[in-house]
C-alpha cells in the first residue's frame, strides 16, 4: 500500500534522530515524521502551485501544536480538547519561522503552510529541536524553491563545558540555554538565555552549535536525495528594468533628501508625498501601470538609498554615527499607586513599565506536556497601535508581542531573586507608548528600573540594546541602537541584554549569508559598550532596590507550625482558613511542611491573623483557664471553644455550684464564658468546668473573710 517509504536515521549528540516519509499524509506537498529518541513530531508542508495575482508579500504560516495524548494525558477544562495555542506553542512556532523565512526567494509569493504536531514526547527531550529538524526535512523534500536545508542545535553551559542538546534535567544546572539554527555556511537565528556569560563565551556557544548541526544538514541532504522529489518549475519573474529606471529617475534624489530628515513622522510624511507624486506621474504616463509593482520597486529603492548612504560612512537616518546611542531619559516612581513603575525613553522609543507584587497563590501554573510547574515571574509586553501613530485592532496579544515579552523576560530572569529570597509572585507589564526600533530592549531597561522601584532585590541592573548590520560585498557597518527603518532595511537584527558583568539574553536574526565570526564579534563588543553606557544612565536614576516595598503592596509574614496542626488551621472543608482570611482581610497560604505565609497590606491585619493561628495551634493545658464561646447546648451540658476552633464539653454538673435542671437556663449559644480544663483523654476530648474557673477567679466571700482574720 505504501509504495516507497523512506527512512533516515543518524546519531546527533547523545540522541538518535529518525526521519520518515511516504506513509502518513501523502496528499500534502511533503510530510515527515521526525523523532529524537521517544519525542516524535509530525510535520506537513503544503504549498500552492500559483500565487495570488498582484500579491506583494510572502504568505508563509507556521503552526505548532502539542497534543496532550503525546504525553498520555487528557486535556483539562470543560471541553476536554486542545484549544488556542499556548504561549509556549506560539514561541516554538516563531522559533521555526525565523530561520526558514529568509531562505525562500524574494520573488516567491506562493502560499506555504507548515503544520507541526507533537505526537509523542519523552519529558527529557524538548520537542522544539526535532520540530525544527523535521520542518527543514519536509521543506527539503517538498520540491518548492527553498535555499535550505537548515540545522538546529540547543547548547548548554554546564560545569564550564558546552553541551549539545542537553536534557531538560541537565538544563536546570546550565548557565546557558541557547538555540542556534543555520545553513551549511551561515548562522541564521540565535535565541538564548544566559547567566551573565561573557561575549566570548556566547560567541563560542553559537559557533559550537553551528558546527555540531552540520551532521543534521548532511543527513537531510541525503534524505532529500533518496526521496528525489522533482523540483518545481518555478522561475522568478523578470525584473521590470524600464519601470525600475523610471522610478529611480523620479524619486531617487528626493529620497536621498527625505532620509536626511531626522524626525520619524516628518520623514514618513515626506516619503509618502514622494510616493504619491511618483504614482501620479506614472499613471499619467500609463493608465494600466501596476501600482502594487510600483510600491515594491519604490520600497526597494528606499532600501538601496539608505544602505548606500550607511556603507559610504554618512551619518545615519537620524543623524547619529554608527556606534551612538540615542538620547536617554530615565524616570522611576511615575505612577503613584502601583507597586513599582518606570518610564524609559530612548529617542523615539518609550516604554511605561509597572511591577506588581502578589502572593505565591498568584503564580501562573503551566501545565505542559513535560509536566506542571509554577512561574513566579511574569512579564507581559503590549504594543498598542498608537505607539507608531496608527489605528488598529486592540485585543489578545499577537505572536510578536508574546515573543518580545519572552525575550525581555529572558534578559531579566538571571538577576531575579529566588522565591525563598523574595516570597512574592512578580508581574511586570511593559506598555510601549512610542516605538521607533528596539522596543523589546527598552522593555528590558524599564523592567529593571520598575523592579528596583518596587523593592525587588534583583542582583544587578539590566539593560538591552539592539544592533544592526548593513553589508555590501566585503564592506559592512555595524549599527548600535537601530531605528525601526534600519532594522527593516538592514541585514541583521541583533539584540543583547545584560548587566555590567555579562550577557543575560541574546537574540539574533540574520537575513543574508556571509555573516562571519568576526562580524558577530564586532557586533557583540560594540553592544557591550552601548549596554554599559545605558546602565550608567540607569544607575544614576536608581542603582539598587528600594529598602522597603510600596505601602500598597502586600507584606508577607512567615511563620512555622507543626505539620500535624495544618488540619486545625484549614478546618473542615477549609472553613477555618476561609474565616481567617475573610475576618482579618489577609491572604494565607499553607505549605506541606507547616510554613504559613500571611499576606496583608496592613500590619495590624497580619498581626491579628498570626495571633489567631497561634491560638489555633497552641496546645491546650490541663488546669489552665481559657475564655471561649458556647457553641452548642445539649441535655447533658454545653460545648465551649477553648483555643480557636477547639471545643470541650462542660458537663451539666460543672456549670454551677448548685444543682441545675436545664442547661439553657444558665447558658446561651454565643455567650462568652471562662472555663478551666479538667482533663484531656486519650482521644483528645477536652473536659471543662465553668464552676471551677469561677471559684479560682472569684474566691468565696467566706474564704476571703477567713483569710482576713
Swiss-Prot record:
Q: Describe the location of the S1 motif domain by residue ranges.
A: 623-691
Q: Recorded E.C. number(s)? A: 2.7.7.8
Q: Which InterPro entries match?
A: ExoRNase_PH_dom1, ExoRNase_PH_dom2, ExoRNase_PH_dom2_sf, KH_dom, KH_dom_type_1, KH_dom_type_1_sf, NA-bd_OB-fold, PNPase
Q: Which GO terms describe its cellular component?
A: cytosol
Query: Which residues belong to any copy of the KH domain?
Result: 554-613
Sequence similarity: Belongs to the polyribonucleotide nucleotidyltransferase family.
Q: Which reaction does it catalyse?
A: RNA(n+1) + phosphate = RNA(n) + a ribonucleoside 5'-diphosphate
Q: How does it assemble?
A: Component of the RNA degradosome, which is a multiprotein complex involved in RNA processing and mRNA degradation.
Could you tell me which PANTHER family the record lists for this protein?
Answer: POLYRIBONUCLEOTIDE NUCLEOTIDYLTRANSFERASE (PTHR11252), POLYRIBONUCLEOTIDE NUCLEOTIDYLTRANSFERASE 1, MITOCHONDRIAL (PTHR11252:SF0)
Q: What are the names of the required cofactors? A: Mg(2+)
A Gene Ontology molecular-function term? polyribonucleotide nucleotidyltransferase activity
Q: Function of this protein?
A: Involved in mRNA degradation. Catalyzes the phosphorolysis of single-stranded polyribonucleotides processively in the 3'- to 5'-direction.
**Which controlled-vocabulary keywords does the entry list?**
Cytoplasm, Magnesium, Metal-binding, Nucleotidyltransferase, RNA-binding, Transferase
**What Gene3D superfamilies does the record point to?**
GHMP Kinase, N-terminal domain, K Homology domain, type 1, Nucleic acid-binding proteins
**Main localization category:** cytoplasm
Report the record's disulfide bonds: none
Give its localization: Cytoplasm
Task: Name the NCBIfam families for this protein.
Answer: polynuc_phos, PRK11824.1
Q: Does the keyword Magnesium apply?
A: yes
Which Pfam family, just one, is annotated for this protein?
Answer: RNase_PH
- On whether Magnesium is a keyword of this UniProt record, the answer is yes
Q: Where does Mg(2+) bind?
A: 487, 493
Q: Write the protein's name.
A: Polyribonucleotide nucleotidyltransferase
What processes in GO biological process is this protein linked to? Answer: mRNA catabolic process; RNA processing
Amino acid at each position: 500500500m505504501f509504495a516507497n517509504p523512506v527512512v533516515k536515521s543518524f546519531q546527533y549528540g547523545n540522541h538518535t534522530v529518525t526521519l520518515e516519509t511516504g506513509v502518513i499524509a501523502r496528499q500534502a506537498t511533503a510530510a515527515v515524521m521526525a523523532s529524537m529518541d521517544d519525542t516524535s513530531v509530525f510535520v506537513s508542508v503544503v504549498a500552492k502551485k500559483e500565487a495570488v495575482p498582484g500579491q506583494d508579500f510572502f504568505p508563509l504560516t507556521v503552526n505548532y501544536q502539542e497534543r496532550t495524548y503525546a504525553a498520555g494525558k487528557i486535556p483539562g477544562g470543560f471541553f476536554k480538547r486542545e484549544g488556542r495555542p499556548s504561549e509556549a506553542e506560539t514561541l516554538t512556532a516563531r522559533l521555526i519561522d525565523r530561520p526558514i523565512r529568509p531562505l525562500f526567494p524574494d520573488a516567491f509569493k506562493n502560499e506555504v503552510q507548515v503544520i507541526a504536531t507533537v505526537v509523542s514526547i519523552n519529558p527529557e527531550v524538548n520537542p522544539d529541536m526535532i520540530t525544527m529538524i523535521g520542518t527543514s526535512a519536509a521543506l527539503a523534500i517538498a520540491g518548492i524553491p527553498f535555499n535550505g536545508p537548515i540545522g538546529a542545535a540547543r547548547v548548554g553551559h554546564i560545569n564550564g563545558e558546552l553541551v549539545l542538546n542537553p536534557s531538560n534535567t541537565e538544563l536546570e544546572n546550565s548557565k546557558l540555554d541557547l538555540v542556534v539554527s543555520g545553513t551549511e555556511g551561515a548562522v541564521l537565528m540565535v535565541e538564548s538565555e544566559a547567566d551573565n556569560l561573557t561575549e566570548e563565551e556566547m560567541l563560542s556557544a553559537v559557533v559550537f552549535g553551528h558546527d555540531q548541526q552540520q551532521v543534521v544538514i548532511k543527513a537531510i541532504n541525503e534524505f532529500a536525495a533518496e526521496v528525489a522529489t522533482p523540483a518545481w518549475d518555478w522561475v522568478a519573474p523578470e525584473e521590470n528594468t524600464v519601470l525600475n529606471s523610471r522610478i529611480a529617475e523620479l524619486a531617487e534624489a528626493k529620497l536621498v533628501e527625505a532620509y536626511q530628515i531626522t524626525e520619524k513622522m516628518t520623514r514618513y510624511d515626506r516619503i509618502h508625498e514622494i510616493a504619491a507624486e511618483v504614482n501620479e506621474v506614472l499613471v499619467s504616463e500609463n493608465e494600466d501601470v501596476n501600482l502594487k509593482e510600483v510600491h515594491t520597486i519604490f520600497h526597494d529603492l528606499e532600501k538601496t538609498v539608505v544602505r548606500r548612504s550607511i556603507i559610504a560612512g554618512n551619518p545615519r537616518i537620524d543623524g547619529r554615527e554608527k556606534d551612538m546611542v540615542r538620547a536617554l531619559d530615565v524616570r522611576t516612581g511615575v505612577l503613584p499607586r502601583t507597586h513599582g513603575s518606570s518610564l524609559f525613553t530612548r529617542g523615539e522609543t518609550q516604554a511605561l513599565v509597572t511591577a506588581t507584587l502578589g502572593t505565591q497563590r498568584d503564580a501562573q501554573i503551566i501545565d505542559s506536556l513535560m509536566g506542571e510547574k509554577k512561574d513566579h515571574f511574569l512579564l507581559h509586553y503590549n504594543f498598542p497601535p498608537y505607539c507608531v501613530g496608527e489605528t488598529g485592532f486592540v485585543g489578545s496579544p499577537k505572536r510578536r508581542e508574546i515573543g518580545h515579552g519572552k525575550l525581555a523576560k529572558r534578559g531579566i530572569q538571571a538577576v531575579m531573586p529566588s522565591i525563598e529570597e523574595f516570597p512574592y509572585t512578580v508581574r511586570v507589564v511593559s506598555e510601549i507608548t512610542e516605538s521607533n526600533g528596539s522596543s523589546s530592549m527598552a522593555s528590558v531597561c524599564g523592567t529593571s528600573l520598575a523592579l528596583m522601584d518596587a523593592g525587588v532585590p534583583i542582583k544587578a541592573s539590566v539593560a538591552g540594546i539592539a544592533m544592526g548590520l548593513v553589508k555590501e560585498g566585503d564592506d559592512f557597518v555595524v549599527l548600535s541602537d537601530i531605528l525601526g527603518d534600519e532594522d527593516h532595511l538592514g541585514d541583521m537584527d541583533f539584540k543583547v541584554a545584560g548587566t555590567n558583568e555579562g550577557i543575560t539574553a541574546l537574540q539574533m536574526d540574520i537575513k543574508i549569508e556571509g555573516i562571519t565570526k568576526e562580524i558577530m564579534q564586532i557586533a557583540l563588543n560594540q553592544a557591550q559598550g552601548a549596554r554599559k553606557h545605558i546602565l550608567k544612565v540607569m544607575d544614576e536614576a536608581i542603582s539598587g532596590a528600594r529598602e522597603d516595598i510600596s505601602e500598597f503592596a502586600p507584606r508577607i509574614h512567615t511563620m512555622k507550625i507543626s505539620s500535624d496542626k495544618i488540619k486545625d488551621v484549614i478546618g473542615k472543608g477549609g472553613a477555618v482558613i476561609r474565616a481567617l482570611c475573610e475576618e482579618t482581610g489577609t491572604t494565607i497560604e499553607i505549605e506541606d511542611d507547616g510554613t504559613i505565609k500571611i499576606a496583608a497590606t496592613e500590619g495590624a491585619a497580619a498581626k491579628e491573623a498570626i495571633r489567631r493561628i497561634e491560638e489555633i495551634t497552641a496546645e491546650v493545658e490541663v488546669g489552665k483557664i481559657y475564655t471561649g464561646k458556647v457553641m452548642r447546648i445539649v441535655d447533658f451540658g454545653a460545648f465551649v471553644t477553648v483555643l480557636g476552633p477547639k471545643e470541650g464539653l462542660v458537663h451539666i454538673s460543672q456549670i454551677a455550684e448548685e444543682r441545675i435542671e436545664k442547661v439553657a437556663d444558665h447558658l446561651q449559644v454565643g455567650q462568652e464564658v471562662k472555663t478551666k480544663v479538667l482533663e484531656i483523654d486519650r482521644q483528645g476530648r477536652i473536659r471543662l468546668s465553668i464552676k471551677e474557673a469561677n471559684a479560682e477567679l472569684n474566691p468565696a466571700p467566706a474564704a476571703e473573710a477567713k483569710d482576713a482574720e
